[in-house]
């Protein structure tokens, strides 16, 4: 089965200079992938020419005449820039012309555009942003929400857990992954009323609920999934990124203080290289916008080509493993058990409709 990925080529801090090389590099490693490059055709073709990939058989260009900047407010993205590369890329997923969309663009705009174009799945009130954070176990902890919903109801946290459970089960091949609820302590009496009520709902659910976890448990790998509201999750993520940069800077500073420390660095290089590979932030680039009727992956805005390629892989893996179908089924099963609504229609297969944007 061929997996088509729509790339918002104009998004992020670096635009086509990062997105196009990343897409071509990904194709060289995955024979069953195709790239739909969305944006200004001349800019995209110029990059393809540099890469000697102008006539690549698994690359198509879809024209978009506008670009959403990192500073554009949500209103501009939704109401004024209707032919932006971001929106056209997301529309490729809606029309079944791509299995996933990857963008390094404005997070708020991407969430708003994706929710407007794709809509949420039946049974899901709010989409959530999920990503993987490295842990001691080596596989990474899936954490959500990371900023889409600053204020949540207990039921939202339960929905987040179900969405993450479905994704981890098929992408990481872990049936019944463990779920932790981020709190200020492990005891059930800890936390505000929303968190305590969410804990009750999770304990009564079909999920493999471990209980409350604290911030350090994310890095210990105590559970496969950690659930929290978007305010707490975003603070935790940004704190993690800041700490990682500080530690890296301090290590570099200490090893370059003198000729002796430089010698020690040379001796320790094999160990440092292995550590760097384990903690390489590029490997964890790409946050999934869960709860929508299509796959959308948000890359870090400042990502380089290597890092953006990992975001593409996240979308590719999710599409190949049927994440949307799994989430849809999970919520349909709960609705059926409760005599509720039926499942949402699954995303159509690529190639279902012609596109007016093909350049």
Curated annotation (Swiss-Prot):
Q: Where in the cell is it found?
A: Cytoplasm
Checking Pfam families in the record gives: FA_synthesis (PF02504)
Q: Which reaction does it catalyse?
A: a fatty acyl-[ACP] + phosphate = an acyl phosphate + holo-[ACP]
* Region span, Disordered: 338-359
- GO MF annotations for this entry? phosphate:acyl-[acyl carrier protein] acyltransferase activity
Instruction: Give yes or no: UniProt keyword Lipid metabolism.
Output: yes
Q: What is its main location?
A: cytoplasm
Keywords of the record: Cytoplasm, Lipid biosynthesis, Lipid metabolism, Phospholipid biosynthesis, Phospholipid metabolism, Transferase
Q: Could you say which protein family the record assigns here?
A: Belongs to the PlsX family.
* Database matches in NCBIfam families: plsX
Database matches in PANTHER family: FATTY ACID/PHOSPHOLIPID SYNTHESIS PROTEIN PLSX, PHOSPHATE ACYLTRANSFERASE
Subunit structure, as described in the record: Homodimer. Probably interacts with PlsY.
Q: What is this protein called?
A: Phosphate acyltransferase
- Which organism does this sequence originate in? Cupriavidus taiwanensis (strain DSM 17343 / BCRC 17206 / CCUG 44338 / CIP 107171 / LMG 19424 / R1) (Ralstonia taiwanensis (strain LMG 19424))
